[in-house]
Amino acid sequence: MPPRRSRERLKAISRILLDTATDAGAPGVDAVYGAGILNVEKAMQAQAPASSFVAADAVLTRFSSLTTSAPFGGSAAAAALSGQVGGMTVFDRYGRDFTMTASTGVRARSSGLLAGAMLAPTDAPWRAAQAEAARFGFATNVGAQAMRRPDVPAVVSFSPVAGQQVTLGTNVAVGGGNGLAGSALRGIASLPVGGMSAWSAGGWSASLSSGTSRDGRLRQQVIGFATPLGFGLELSDLAERGQVLGMRGDAALGLSGGRTTLATLTYRRTLVGVDLTARATASSTRAHGGSNLLRFDGPLIGSAFSLEGARELFGGRATLGLSSTLRVERARAVLLAPVSFDLVTGALSTRAVAVDLAPNDRELDLELGWSTALSRTSLFRVGIARAFDAGHVAGASDTAAFVTIAIR
């Protein structure tokens, strides 16, 4: 190293050591620093006004103001994104560079088996419409107590002509399941509740349902068809407000919502006394809004599936199911990531990063349940579920169980 450069570097080091020295008394020989004690630990830290560090942390917080959801991989996606946008290089007043990380990184929403409302508000058997309870050709569960319980599902059925049946309902779960595993949309929003109408005749059936989640962020409409051969098709339209498949951000990200179309093929068949139901779902999502901080490049493609078997057992009905919630298969996006920040001038440099937010693993849920009517006016349900690679995160697991006793 040339002597001149060595002298300049030694002078800079001396300046830093003197500026960061601990004042230990009244001024002595040196009228400025007095009797001081060198503080090497402090000298090794970035030196700038306290407000500069607050400003730098605010910059990182703005870039990290994202909350991921289960379809994107939950906590695994949050960790990966934090590595991209949760840190940067800062320069202090002496031109030295340091690495700084955000005080709050990218967060992940809960997506466990108890997230949302997995236990759909199904109607008890004694409240379901029965043909023998028909009044003027109608069968209904709407009675004198319905006015006192406006949140209870109400169903009315009637037969317009022989061999056909029409069912109308309100306060019913839309797109949900009967157990802990719930619907394919678990982890995106709470279970939508709304109205439904269905028609069936000779093995053919058609249905239409529409509902809104409790927080008002999600509205789902479902049209379903089924044939006598057991094959069926469901088309769903999912409108989200302020989120995209459950992913949320603050105003700076500009995610105003998303629109998802889901197509589900269903197959039902009874084999050796076991009622089998299989479902395979494909989805396409268009994100609305966005900003230079986060912009999706094209549609988000996802998939889900479930397989369930049910049969009479021990005087009740036992179910065993294997399912996987909605998982994003392709989600290409462009992120704006911070690179460096000058603590003195406030100058910020950034770079664009292309990422695919699709997770590498898939959650599998195994569920066992059993239910029986204890009497004409009481129902008992019990179930347990185990999630492997929960939230589409490798090695993560979740276990949940429920016991329900309903007495009228």
Where does each model-flagged region fall?
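Hydrolase catalytic cores
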Residues: 1-33
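Secreted peptidase-domain scaffold signal
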Residues: 43-132
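Caspase-like cysteine protease fold
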Residues: 27-50
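Hydrophobic alpha-helix feature that most strongly marks membrane-spanning transmembrane helices
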Residues: 22, 270-272, 312, 375, ...
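Outer membrane beta-barrel translocator domains of Type V secretion systems
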Residues: 109-271, 281-282
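Outer-membrane beta-barrel "beta-signal"
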Residues: 313, 396-408
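Outer membrane beta-barrel transmembrane domains
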Residues: 178-179, 183-187, 193-195, 207, ...
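Surface-exposed loop and membrane-interface regions of Gram-negative outer-membrane beta-barrel proteins
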Residues: 390-392
